[in-house]
Amino acid sequence: MRLLHTMLRVGDLQRSIDFYTKVLGMKLLRTSENPEYKYSLAFVGYGPETEEAVIELTYNWGVDKYELGTAYGHIALSVDNAAEACEKIRQNGGNVTREAGPVKGGTTVIAFVEDPDGYKIELIEEKDAGRGLGN
């Protein structure tokens, strides 16, 4: 068993694709349209779906905003340097909501950003994080 994807409902599919690809450095892996049920999908990630978990962006036609509620927490991404990643995100128009610094009660360096729909994304500093944002 392995994790395949996390689905996020978005109010503007192209805006979300732009954020995840241009701001966070992911690749657009595939898209699909379902006119019968009036929704569109886009899958984004740092590697192929056959090897890594990805994010499914779901746009339900005509719905431009969702209530996020209080149950959802965040998605976490590893970065080589959280402060540099925040600066890069800011330069690309992203919203940094918590600057890089140690997690409360610990030493791991983290930061938080929000996507255009308000979903929180944690950046966790891990040296040699691999490919993707901050690398």
From Swiss-Prot:
Enzyme class: lyase
Residues the entry annotates as binding Ni(2+): 5, 56, 74, 122
Matches recorded under SUPFAM superfamilies: Glyoxalase/Bleomycin resistance protein/Dihydroxybiphenyl dioxygenase
Catalytic residues as annotated in Swiss-Prot or TrEMBL: 122
Record-annotated VOC domain positions: 2-126
InterPro entries in alphabetical order: Glyas_Bleomycin-R_OHBP_Dase, Glyas_Fos-R_dOase_dom, Glyoxalase_1, Glyoxalase_1_CS, VOC
Induction field: Repressed by NemR. Induced by reactive electrophilic species (RES) such as quinones, glyoxals and methylglyoxal. Up-regulated by HOCl.
Pfam families for this protein: Glyoxalase
Catalytic activities: (R)-S-lactoylglutathione = methylglyoxal + glutathione
Enzyme nomenclature, EC number: 4.4.1.5
Cofactor: Ni(2+)
Annotated residues for binding of substrate: 9, 60, 74
Domain of life: Bacteria
Keywords assigned: Detoxification, Lyase, Metal-binding, Nickel
Single annotated GO MF: protein homodimerization activity
Biological process according to GO: methylglyoxal catabolic process to D-lactate via S-lactoyl-glutathione; response to toxic substance
Entry similarity comment: Belongs to the glyoxalase I family.
PANTHER family: LACTOYLGLUTATHIONE LYASE (PTHR46036:SF5)
Role, per record: Catalyzes the isomerization of the hemithioacetal formed spontaneously from methylglyoxal and glutathione, to S-lactoylglutathione, which is then hydrolyzed by a type II glyoxalase (GloB or GloC). Is involved in methylglyoxal (MG) detoxification. Involved in resistance to hypochlorous acid (HOCl), which is the active component of household bleach and a powerful antimicrobial during the innate immune response.
Name this polypeptide is given: Lactoylglutathione lyase
Species of provenance: Escherichia coli (strain K12)
Classification of source organism: Bacteria, Pseudomonadati, Pseudomonadota, Gammaproteobacteria, Enterobacterales
Gene: gloA
